[in-house]
């Protein structure tokens, strides 16, 4: 049964015929065959090689011939004979084993391995479809073939189409896109090709061979000029390095040169050893600028005081507790002692008018904190039987402070004597009280004004200045347009004012409420409130606080002699000092030195202070 398959022959349509390698690249060429075939087609060459062997028209003759084209050092007869028996055995196995696909597949794999393996093995010597020459070699031949040893890109394309058979039918735009792109790529890739600018306008550059003989193989791609690979920057870095070395050598001889002081600084670029800062040595480093953080502080905003702790900063603006206030104002326990409280009670008995001012009393610093952040104290150098000043009704304004001459105050009076002084420092409230007032105008006046702008580097406690008869009061600054002309027949008794403390560069507005009275009488006139004059410029403030004074119409100037009247018995022993100053020099020297500052005030009605209604003037200062 093993002999039967040799007689049976398979149909020629089913024999494993070799397929031309048209679908693969590169195509088989006649020069690859080591046989004696001279034809370009594999099938005819196979037939010509098989016929002389006497192999009579066997069905597998063409397959053996194709195999012979790719065989080396093997006899064509052996190959043809072996291949003739293979189909016979395959055909015999088909009807017997009932597994025809397996043996033919194995045979086809063997034949395919011979067909596919051999060409790849032999094609290793052929780099491209047109031969062993690369694109770079073809470009080199094209340039060398020209008379001037230079070609434009279009001339290189033309030479390729004319000289290389592979590109003869690929000169049109559709089929030339690929290889033309490869040529451009190789021209840019290899350093052996250099581009020379064409002299003519509108013409492409010349491509020439590098006379220095650049690398023909793959070299690092030439990228666009940058600081890393541009020769100009490399040269500049070299010059900078040399210059730096020369500067350093020169610095040793002359240590006071400008370059030496830059390089000696720790933050100077010249002090760094990194090469990235080489170029900086020729420039003026920004660290030498007086605006640098290394140099002195140039900010127009004044720095915060170093001696102010966190608790001292806002203690006067927002007193957290009585204990905190006592720590902020060390003399608070002294000025609010029981003696002052008794004086306050005695003085309250004098207030017989229905519109009298009721001042809340506190017996100890611990109870001085009211619902609103207010506090009361009287200067320790006074022995007045006047009410302890209740520092309410005015919110603190904010500004920077520095030790200045004087803080002015103005007192609005209507031909009535004023007695005592009441400075009010407080948070919210006067605006609402003025707006809701239902009493006739001109009875009581509560007119808040802008704060006096002061600058002080140290906190100064308020000091009272006693102004008696024949005392001339300086008043300067501007006031609202509805200021009244004050009569010189009125006089002011101690006007207590407090200079503000430096709190984060913020100024505190001052307001003075004066309680007028008639000497020798047991009743007091309705309360008149004196207010502070707004300062348009920062004023220098000495240890003395503001002065309560009678204002002239223009807001500043020398005041006339005040009305002379006998002081109360408790004030006869007080020290009275005549205050006089040159207003013109103060205005020129002090007021004009500063810059105007804008302030906004939000006055709100406090919970405890002035139970009686406060009346406004007919020309209310409150804006709608």
UniProtKB/Swiss-Prot annotation:
Gene3D superfamilies according to UniProt: Winged helix-like DNA-binding domain superfamily/Winged helix DNA-binding domain (1.10.10.10)
Cellular component GO terms, alphabetical: cytoplasm; nucleus
Start and end residues of each stretch annotated as Required for interaction with RUNX2: 333-428
Post-translational modification summary for this protein: Phosphorylation by NLK promotes nuclear export and inhibits the transcriptional activity. In response to growth factors, phosphorylation on Thr-24, Ser-226 and Ser-292 by PKB/AKT1 promotes nuclear export and inactivation of transactivational activity. Phosphorylation on Thr-24 is required for binding 14-3-3 proteins. Phosphorylation of Ser-226 decreases DNA-binding activity and promotes the phosphorylation of Thr-24 and Ser-289, permitting phosphorylation of Ser-292 and Ser-295, probably by CDK1, leading to nuclear exclusion and loss of function. Ubiquitinated by SKP2. Ubiquitination leads to proteasomal degradation. Ubiquitinated by STUB1/CHIP; when Ser-226 is phosphorylated.
Site residues (DNA-binding), renumbered to this chain: 128, 135, 195
Region feature (Sufficient for interaction with NLK): 253-532
PROSITE patterns (alphabetical): FORK_HEAD_2 (PS00658), FORK_HEAD_3 (PS50039)
Biased composition (Polar residues): 279-296
Region Disordered, residue ranges: 1-62, 94-128, 204-306
Biological process annotations from GO: apoptotic process; autophagy; cell differentiation; cellular response to hyperoxia; cellular response to insulin stimulus; cellular response to nitric oxide; cellular response to oxidative stress; cellular response to starvation
Annotated Low complexity bias: 37-62, 105-119
Keywords for this protein: Acetylation, Activator, Apoptosis, Autophagy, Cytoplasm, Differentiation, DNA-binding, Methylation, Nucleus, Phosphoprotein, Transcription, Transcription regulation, Ubl conjugation
Record-given protein name: Forkhead box protein O1
Top-level taxon of the source organism: Eukaryota
Database matches in SMART domains: FH
DNA-binding region: 130-224
Modified residues (Omega-N-methylarginine): 221, 223
Motif stretch (Required for interaction with SIRT1): 431-435
């Amino acid at each position: 049964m093993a002999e039967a398959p040799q007689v049976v022959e398979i149909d020629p349509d089913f024999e494993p015929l070799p397929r031309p390698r048209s679908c693969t690249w590169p195509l088989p060429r006649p020069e690859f065959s080591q046989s004696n075939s001279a034809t370009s087609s594999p099938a005819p060459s196979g037939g010509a090689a098989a016929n002389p062997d006497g192999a009579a028209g066997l069905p597998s003759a063409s397959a053996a011939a194709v195999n012979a084209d790719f065989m080396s050092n093997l006899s064509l007869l052996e190959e043809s004979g072996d291949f003739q028996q293979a189909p016979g055995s395959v055909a015999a196995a088909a009807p017997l084993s009932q597994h025809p696909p397996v043996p033919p597949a194995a045979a086809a794999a063997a034949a395919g391995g011979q067909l596919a393996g051999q060409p790849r093995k032999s094609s290793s010597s052929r780099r491209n479809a047109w031969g062993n020459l690369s694109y770079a070699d073809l470009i080199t031949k094209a340039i060398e073939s020209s008379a001037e040893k230079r070609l434009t890109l279009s001339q290189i394309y033309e030479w390729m189409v004319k000289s290389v058979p592979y590109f003869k039918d690929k000169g049109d735009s559709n089929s030339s896109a690929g290889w033309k792109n490869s040529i451009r790529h190789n021209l840019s890739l290899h350093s052996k090709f250099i581009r020379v600018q064409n002299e003519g306008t509108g013409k492409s550059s010349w491509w020439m061979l590098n006379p220095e003989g650049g690398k023909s193989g793959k070299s690092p791609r030439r990228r666009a000029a940058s600081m890393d690979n541009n020769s100009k920057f490399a040269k500049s870095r070299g010059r900078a390095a040399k210059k730096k070395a020369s500067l350093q050598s020169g610095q040793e001889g002359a240590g006071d040169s400008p370059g030496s002081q830059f390089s000696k600084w720790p933050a100077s670029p010249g002090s760094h050893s990194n090469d990235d800062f080489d170029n900086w040595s020729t420039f003026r480093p920004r660290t030498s600028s007086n605006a640098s953080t290394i140099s002195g502080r140039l900010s127009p905003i004044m720095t915060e005081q170093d001696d102010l702790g966190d608790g001292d900063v806002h203690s006067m603006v927002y007193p957290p507790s009585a204990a905190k206030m006592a720590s902020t104002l060390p003399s608070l326990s002294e000025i609010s002692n029981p003696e002052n409280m008794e004086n306050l009670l005695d003085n309250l008995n004098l207030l017989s008018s229905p519109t009298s001012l009721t001042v809340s009393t506190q017996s100890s610093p611990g109870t001085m904190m009211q619902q609103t952040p207010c506090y009361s104290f009287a200067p320790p150098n006074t022995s007045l039987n006047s009410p302890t000043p209740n520092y309410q009704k005015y919110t603190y304004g904010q500004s920077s402070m520095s030790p200045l001459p004087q803080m002015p105050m103005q007192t609005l009076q209507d031909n009535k004597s004023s007695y005592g002084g009441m400075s009010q420092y407080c948070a919210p409230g006067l605006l609402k009280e003025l707006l809701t007032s239902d009493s006739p105008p001109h009875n009581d006046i509560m007119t808040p004004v802008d704060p006096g702008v002061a600058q002080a580097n140290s906190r100064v406690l308020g000091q009272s200045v006693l102004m008696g008869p024949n005392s001339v009061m300086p008043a300067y600054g501007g006031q609202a347009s509805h200021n009244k002309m004050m009569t010189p027949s009125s006089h002011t008794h101690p006007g207590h004012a407090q200079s503000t403390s430096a709190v984060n560069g913020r100024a505190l507005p001052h307001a003075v409420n004066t309680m007028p009275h008639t000497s020798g009488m047991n009743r007091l006139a309705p309360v008149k409130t004196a207010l502070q004059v707004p300062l348009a410029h920062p004023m220098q403030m000495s240890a003395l606080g503001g002065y309560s004074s009678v204002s002239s119409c223009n807001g500043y100037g020398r005041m006339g002699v005040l009305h002379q009247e006998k002081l109360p018995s408790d004030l006869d022993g007080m020290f009275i000092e005549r205050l006089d100053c040159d207003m013109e020099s103060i205005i020129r020297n002090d007021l004009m030195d500063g810059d105007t500052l804008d302030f906004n005030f939000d006055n709100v009605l406090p919970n405890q202070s002035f139970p009686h209604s406060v009346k406004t003037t007919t020309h209310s200062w409150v804006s709608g």
